Amino acid sequence: MSLKNSLVIYGGSFNPPHNGHIIIAQLVREMFRFADFHVVTSSTPPHKKVDVSFKERFFLTKKAFEKVEGITVSDIEHRLGGVSYAINTIEYYEKKYSHIFFLVGEDALYSIEKWYRYEDILKKAHMLVYPRFKDELVYKKVERVLESLSNSIYILKLPLIQISSTVVRERAIKGLSLYGFVPQHIISYVEEIYGNR
């Protein structure tokens, strides 16, 4: 298969974006140098409640990735409107790109059968899965999915990055240092947005 005219989509609520997101994006960008790379901020995620506005999260995500070469931060899910289903984003981009790669954490893979139109997602895009946990047994939970959809799902060999948006939010609320957790140039913004909650 020719991989010309390809796109990697890295979607998420980015609530807030952190250094783990940036490291993962950089590592995958290096693996897929031939492809465009779009970081897509979810407007209205279907599976989680987000108490920070899209406008604030998108602003932080743009700021967080502004110094990362070769990456575009997109507001397409906000422009499309409604609930931010992955399939809608993929179908928007497939009009322009021949090959779509959708980057997710391994925890998202466990519930993929519950995703809206998940079979269409796996027909239209290749899933790139990055590790979130050390426990080898977790893969047994998705064995049946991997066996039936092995042509669509690729487990990436990347280092485990132990930073989460939940931890960053909790630290901001408690007034603890965010140094090393988020890019230095957005620390004050994250503190302002999340520290007052």
UniProtKB/Swiss-Prot annotation:
Its EC number is 2.7.7.18. Keywords: ATP-binding, NAD, Nucleotide-binding, Nucleotidyltransferase, Pyridine nucleotide biosynthesis, Transferase. SUPFAM superfamilies: Nucleotidylyl transferase. The keyword Hydrolase does not apply. Gene3D superfamilies: HUPs. It catalyses: nicotinate beta-D-ribonucleotide + ATP + H(+) = deamido-NAD(+) + diphosphate. InterPro entries: Cyt_trans-like, NadD/NMNAT, Rossmann-like_a/b/a_fold. It is an enzyme of class 2 (transferase). GO terms for molecular function: ATP binding; nicotinate-nucleotide adenylyltransferase activity. GO terms for biological process: NAD biosynthetic process. This is Probable nicotinate-nucleotide adenylyltransferase. The gene is nadD.
